[in-house]
Amino acid sequence: SLKHIREYCASTALVQMALNIHNEVSPDHSTPLRQRQLQVLAGDFYSGKFYQILAHRGDTHVIHFLSDAVCLINQARTNLYDLFLNNQLSVEKYVHETEKICTALLKSWLQHERTKDNDNWDKLVSNLLTAEQLIADLSGTLPAYWPSSVNTQLQQKAWQLIEQSRLLVQDWDSQKTKRELEHLIEVTFPGVTHLGIAEEC
């Protein structure tokens, strides 16, 4: 029912919010302790609401696979941190772990809700969410020791993922879904042409 869909969407959004807030807790001790404690508590609050909604519905299976996704995300973030500390973070590893972080929650739903288009949805989710994050990371969250050429590599990778998504959507069976996905890509990545070249503003 529509109510169930809304509750599932709300639960997944709450999990993502909890992850985002916890990830923003600064390890820098110059940040006031109280501020960091409040951030942790805020993340715990959203995480608790996610459990509350699904437990009330008796959806233990959903709790289980979303919790598994959270574990995967946290492990990927730990991997990135360890690689960064040891100066072993390559572009390939960065993209690989970023893809896990960006897509684990939605992919857990795709594995739960099997459909004939499941493989296409899986590829589309991976491509678009990873591309979106890579473009965001180009704003300044990349390791300082990486050469400037890395920016070009990540930008090209993002464009490649976007173009792969466009080609994937072209073969979509449902024309309505195809139009909606094409619109989504154009709205989300307005400065990228079909050739993967940023348009002049």
Predicted features, each with a name:
Residues 1-201:
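All-alpha prenyltransferase/terpene-synthase fold signal
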